[in-house]
């Protein structure tokens, strides 16, 4: 939708003005915006991107990532890590918001459990017949 392209562009420009950790914003068309960050900052979760915006920051350890994860983060996608290692990372750092750890490309796959909730249980009704 054209409005999404415009909102994505405006959001990228607004973030470039507000936050000093943006190194570059690259896009060849309106489908994908790549925003390179120098580091995370305390309001990183407010610097979100939508509709095809990818933010990239290089970190030395996953512990740096744990500093910005809050209850708004529900799914951790991965490439190049074992599930067990990431499970330990989430548990050891007490990352309460993370309730799904899935490979990249599977983040939108829906199962019976979604974002920590039993979908069937929440959308079903039990009728007792006596």
Predicted regions and their residues:
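Short beta-strand/turn micro-motifs composed of small residues
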Residues: 80
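NAD(P)-dependent aldehyde/semialdehyde dehydrogenase
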Residues: 1-77, 85-96, 101-121, 126
């Amino acid at each position: 939708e054209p409005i999404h392209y415009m909102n994505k562009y405006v959001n990228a420009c607004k973030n470039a003005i507000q936050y000093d950790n943006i190194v570059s914003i690259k896009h060849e068309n309106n489908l994908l915006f790549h925003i390179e960050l120098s580091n995370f900052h305390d309001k990183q979760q407010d610097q979100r991107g939508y509709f095809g915006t990818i933010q990239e920051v290089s970190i030395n350890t996953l512990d740096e990532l744990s500093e910005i994860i809050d209850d708004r983060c529900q799914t951790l996608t991965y490439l190049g890590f074992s599930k067990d290692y990431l499970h330990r990372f989430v548990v050891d750092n007490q990352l309460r918001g993370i309730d799904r750890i899935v490979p990249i490309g599977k983040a939108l796959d829906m199962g019976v459990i979604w974002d920590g909730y039993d979908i069937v249980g929440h959308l079903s009704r039990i009728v007792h017949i006596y």
